[in-house]
Structure formats: structure tokens, C-alpha cells
Amino acid sequence: MKLRNVSKNNLNKEDTKLSIEQFGGNVEWFNITKTLSESLPYIQQFSGETFIIKYGGAAMTDKKLAESFAHDVVLLKQLGINPIVVHGGGNKINEFLEKINKKSTFINGLRITDAETLEIVEMVLCGLVNKNITQLINNAGGNAIGLCGKDANLIEAKKICYTYKENQSNNVEKILDMGFVGEPHDINTDLLFFMEESDFIPVIAPVCSGENNLTYNVNADLVAGALANAMAAAKLIILTNVSGVTDSNGNLISELSVSHAENLIDNGTAHTGMIPKLQTCVKVVKEGYGSAHIIDGRIPHVLLLELFTIHGTGTMVVNSGV
């Protein structure tokens, strides 16, 4: 099914135009009514669809933001939308690694992971972070189930490697071994569809199994993107610690075409942790039929603001546009 593009620049703003005078000058009534009226076309369009939400950053570490996120996820489910949450946990991993005086090296936003680091990653993501998120959603009235990629072979991974040129004077490429770092290879969609139909909200930690029963640390953005394509999700939403994607002058780009996103990666405007996020969004939009959003998780109830209001808050990546 091809979704109609109800984008921020596409919606007829006159359809929901209201004035404060209509509410006797009461700004609170005006704002509440305006927000609710703007949300209707989005709710109608996306009822029954799957949203993949990558959860991380400040929205995880701040108690009030975490609670507002959990309430938003439950509300999506109540509106007939099927949210699937994929979480990171880099800050908590760093905290535990510091306790054993171990530092991490990152390449293009991915953590090089040796055997010792992998044990910490699995313990923190699957045993601590995942269960905390699950409990928050359940406390908000949802039916969340915590999983990792290993459970029921939910996500199978394969080892990821990078090549690089050690000397610019020749074209000899060397392979950079990232350790136990993988990328999604296969998704057990049957399990996820069953959970959606059973009114459960999956909460997934990005620790996965691969060949020879090896365990891999997989970037949560990549997992979210793979799930979005496998589940034919209407939307991929990535929460970050920034306002969204910005241009070279630091200005927020509210709607971003695939070609523009690729240019930002190629010219270095997008860097470090934003690289896998944009790469994931581009891949999802190219191969799927929905849109991808990069939004500021520091804003309370940012999911609702981005998804159900005309202007939104962050950056939406689409297959056509600016």
C-alpha cells in the first residue's frame, strides 16, 4: 500500500485555521483545540500502521522526559497505531565502562566492540535499560514486552567491517576490524506481527546473534531502519539530542529530500553520530514507502508534536521535496 503524503508542507493549513478571537481570547483553549484539530488527518491516515521508534539520548536519561515518552507510546497504541521501540543506551554503557577504566573508540558513530566491551553492552542494554523502558511503558498503561535481537531469532546479524586507505599516495585498502559489531541481516517479522495483533508493544535492545552463535553489538539506528523496511512501517522516528538535521550554518532543515540528505553526508555537514541516522533514514525512504523523522528528544511529548501537528518539530526525510 502506498501512503498518501501528508507532509508539513503538503497539508492545507486553511482547513484547520482558527483564531484566538473565536475562543474569547482564551489562549489555552485556542492552543488545545488547534492541536487536537490538526491531529485528525494524521490519526486517520496512520491508524493500523506500524511506527518504528528509535529511543535514545536525553529522552532516556531524564526522568520526566522518559515518562512523557512512555505516555506518548501508549497513546499511539490507543489511537490504533502499532509502535515498536528500539533503544540505544550509549551513556549507560559508557558509565559502566568507566568503572573498569575502559575507553571506547568510535568509527562513523559505531563503537568498536571487543569481547569485554560486548559483555558490558549486553548486560546494560538487555538487562538494565531494556527492562527500565518496558516498565515505564507498562506503568503508563501499555502492554510492553522487552526483547533483544537474540530472542526467538528476532534479528540475525552479520559482522560489519570498514575499509580504509592507510596512505593516500596509493590505492591499497585495509580492513578495519570493528570487533563484535554487526549489522541487521534478517528479521523475524512473524513474531512482531503476532505481538502487534496481540496488543503488545515490543521494546527491542540491539544485541543480536550471528553466524557460529556469535553475539553482535548492532547500532540501534541500523536496527530501527531494518525493522522499518521489514515491517513496511509507515514511519521511522529517531530521537536525538539535537533539534534535527541542520545545514552548514546550523539552521534546522524541516523537510529533507533523499538527495539532499546524501549530500550532507558526502560533504561532511553531517558527522559522527548523525551519519548512521541519516544513512538509515535514506535507506528506509528509498526502499520503503513511508517517511523518516529525526527529532529532538529533549522536548516533552515530542513524538506527538512531530507526528500530529502541521509544523512538527524536527526533520522529516522524504523521497521527494526540497
Curated annotation (Swiss-Prot):
Which GO cellular component terms, listed alphabetically, does the Swiss-Prot or TrEMBL entry include?
A: cytoplasm
Task: Report the catalytic activity.
Answer: N-acetyl-L-glutamate + ATP = N-acetyl-L-glutamyl 5-phosphate + ADP
The protein's role, per its UniProt record: Catalyzes the ATP-dependent phosphorylation of N-acetyl-L-glutamate.
Q: Which organism is it from?
A: Ehrlichia ruminantium (strain Gardel)
**E.C. designation(s):** 2.7.2.8
User: Which UniProt keyword terms apply here?
Assistant: Amino-acid biosynthesis, Arginine biosynthesis, ATP-binding, Cytoplasm, Kinase, Nucleotide-binding, Transferase
* Family affiliation: Belongs to the acetylglutamate kinase family. ArgB subfamily.
Q: Where in the cell is it found?
A: Cytoplasm
What's the name of the protein?
Answer: Acetylglutamate kinase
Which N-terminal residues, if any, form the signal peptide?
Answer: none
Q: Encoded by which gene?
A: argB
Primary residence? cytoplasm
Q: Locate the site labelled Transition state stabilizer.
A: 54, 277
Annotated pathway: Amino-acid biosynthesis; L-arginine biosynthesis; N(2)-acetyl-L-ornithine from L-glutamate: step 2/4
Q: Which domain of life is it from?
A: Bacteria
